[in-house]
């Protein structure tokens, strides 16, 4: 089917989201996604209402016969927040074509898209090709932490510089850097690490976070935040010359024990598909995939 016949044969429209329709919009968004950190409609609605007006204006409703059947967020050359009401997924390609037309009218040529893999077929039909994907994993917390022969202590804000350099070393040459993850100059890294302490990725949980020390040297770290209703592994790293000795497992299990002591029943993390050593570690501690994969794809101009 050609793009022209697709666009002409399906009566869907794309309209800027009106605040009065925000509840219906986010209800539709949640209903069409399985890869979300939470299905709590109120959390998503509150996050939207807290955005500055220019960011609220990046949200568009997919409508049919005046009813919201889908959601999408548009950046200058980016599609995200895409979701369709489960009974209307056959309209996905037509909705995406409308979104692409808006972006191209604004001067976009190449377009990057972020979506759940249940929508990969309509994106692929319009020329998008997968670059990478990440998945959410969750595990029940438990108190039986593995023994560890290094000093553990909660990280403090004045350790931002040391943690920055540690994480930069951990991720140097990592497979994720090919996808633009964990890259950038030291100043950006420092801002990122400082932001974790300040709550940019959810409320920082110092009592569940640890750095592992050998003397004054950081050889491992786990940073936990409380993000969208559940504790999250914001960062986990082990020095390259200390890998394969159980330190990553010990850090995870220590954090899980602390969380269990706080009556937090589950812990979540995100991992890039293809990072097989990390996935194997997580599965060995009872982490399992929750929902679909979150895909990043690209349409070249």
Describe each region flagged by the PLM.
Residues 68-83, 131-133, 204, 226-234, ...:
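A conserved beta-turn-beta hairpin within the catalytic core of GNAT-like acetyltransferases
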Residues 32-103, 214, 222-231:
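Conserved donor-binding loop and adjoining core beta-sheet/short helix segment
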Residues 9-27, 151-177:
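A short beta-loop-alpha structural element at the N-terminal edge
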Residues 89-102, 238, 244-261, 280-284:
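Conserved acetyl-CoA-binding loop-helix of GNAT-fold acetyltransferases
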Residues 27-42, 166-182, 200-201:
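Helix-loop element at the rim of GNAT/NAT acetyltransferase active sites that forms part
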